[in-house]
Design a protein with these regions (language model features):
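N-terminal secretory signal peptides that target proteins for export/translocation
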Residues: 1-5
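Basic, ligand-binding patches in group-transfer machinery
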Residues: 7-179
Length: 179
């Protein structure tokens, strides 16, 4: 007995399944498979904006870390609001914000002597003011984002932030920064 199957029906079914896959797979992949570069949840009350922060955004590179395709955001920043405070007393958090979305990424300190040499007149320990953060673009909605850095004191909890002149742009295919 021969089964008669319409070729157009089979092609329609295959195309429908492919479309469903490409629509629903990226969020499922991001939620269940990515372990690095995930935005964190923090309480973000009204913070004082300050200009008492020296900073530079050095780059946004694509990297593969633990088998995951990520972006590494890196640069340096330190507060000059209270020169008696140690820089290590502050936790730094990367904020990327658009009109409709806001994401927070913890910044990891990286040792470096070049900032210490450049700002030797401040008499501060600046050896760990370099930072980097892993960012998985699959968690970020397409759009144009402003970049901010939050400084949160580890002991007394006071916080302030510096808005940078850097824009982060998330397109459907990539993440870029414009300075």
């Amino acid at each position: 007995m021969k089964i008669n199957i319409n070729k157009n029906w089979v092609h329609g079914l295959i195309w429908s399944l492919m479309i469903i896959f490409f629509i629903f797979f990226p969020p499922v992949y991001a939620k269940f498979y990515l372990k690095q570069g995930i935005p964190v949840q923090i309480e973000y009350d009204f913070l004082q904006q300050t200009e008492d922060v020296e900073y530079a955004v050095d780059g946004l590179d694509t990297i593969v870390y633990d088998g995951e395709n990520l972006y590494r955001f890196w640069g340096w920043a330190f507060q000059t609001k209270d020169l008696s405070e140690k820089q290590s007393d502050y936790e730094r958090i990367l904020v990327i914000r658009s009109n409709s979305n806001i994401y927070f990424f913890p910044l990891t300190a990286m040792p470096s002597q070049d900032i210490q040499v450049a700002y030797k007149g401040l008499n501060m320990d600046l050896t760990n003011v370099r930072y980097s953060a892993f960012i998985a673009k699959d968690f970020i909605a397409p759009g144009i984002y402003s970049v901010e850095i939050i400084f949160k004191h580890r002991i007394n909890g006071t916080s302030f932030y510096r808005k940078t002149d850097v824009k982060m742009i998330r397109t459907p295919n990539r993440l870029v920064i414009k300075q």
